[in-house]
């Protein structure tokens, strides 16, 4: 990679992932996947269910280890880090948005968003102020003190998006973030997520089944046969 282009926000090289099935056979999920994203770039990954899209995201986020290959976030090779250093990197430099929001139900919207900042050692008052500002940015300025059970599904996912972005991650990994939402709410959520990542200069990998929403990303790739291909490429 040239110095002129600089260091990628996240880069994967030669990723393989295999599992042993119940019958003892080997299941090949990823077969030499390469992927590189620059700061502020959004890449959508589409593909049939069971092709390994979520597995790829988990490996990029340091939540699962590849059978072979490497992942780099900035200058850091994930699998050369200690467990403590890897946890620190995930908390400070990566943001995760899943299909299920995983909000803490006993805490308010603003308290859920504050959590990453509090874990990073930021004081309560500045963490709360930053969280309120970001919740307002995603259209929840009247929902600061509502708990998840008092919010709609779309509102809960917007809280999850704010939580993913609050620590200003360099990479956001989003796995079907609108999968449980109606089309209109899902489209609104995707727009918020894309705009917020671009404004903050965060790279984003978005897994989605919705080709119309995927088309709004800078690139669209298809995971098929264990490989990432341009979405318009002929099937393997």
What are these regions (language model features)?
Residues 8-216, 220-223:
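ABC family nucleotide-binding domain
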Residues 1-18, 229-236:
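ABC-family P-loop ATPase nucleotide-binding domain
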């Amino acid at each position: 990679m040239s110095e002129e282009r600089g260091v990628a926000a996240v880069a994967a090289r030669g990723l393989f992932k295999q599992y042993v099935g119940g019958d003892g056979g080997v299941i090949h999920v990823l077969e030499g996947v390469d992927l590189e994203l620059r700061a502020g770039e959004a890449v959508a990954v589409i593909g049939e269910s069971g092709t390994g899209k979520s597995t790829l995201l988990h490996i990029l986020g340091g939540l699962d280890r590849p059978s072979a290959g490497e992942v780099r976030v900035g200058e850091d090779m994930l699998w050369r880090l200690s467990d403590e250093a890897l946890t620190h990197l995930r908390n400070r430099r990566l943001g995760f948005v899943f299909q299920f929001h995983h909000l803490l139900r006993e805490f308010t919207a603003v308290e859920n968003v504050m959590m990453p900042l509090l874990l990073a050692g930021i004081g309560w008052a500045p963490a709360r102020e930053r969280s309120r500002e970001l919740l307002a940015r995603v259209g929840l300025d009247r929902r600061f003190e509502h708990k998840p059970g008092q919010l709609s599904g779309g509102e809960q996912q917007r809280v999850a998006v704010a939580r993913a972005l609050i620590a200003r991650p360099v990479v956001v990994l989003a796995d079907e973030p609108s999968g449980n939402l109606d089309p209109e709410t899902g489209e609104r959520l995707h727009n918020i997520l894309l705009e917020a990542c671009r404004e903050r200069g965060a790279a984003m990998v978005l897994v989605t089944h919705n080709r119309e929403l995927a088309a709004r990303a800078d690139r669209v790739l298809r995971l098929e046969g264990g490989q990432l291909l341009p979405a318009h490429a002929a099937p393997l």
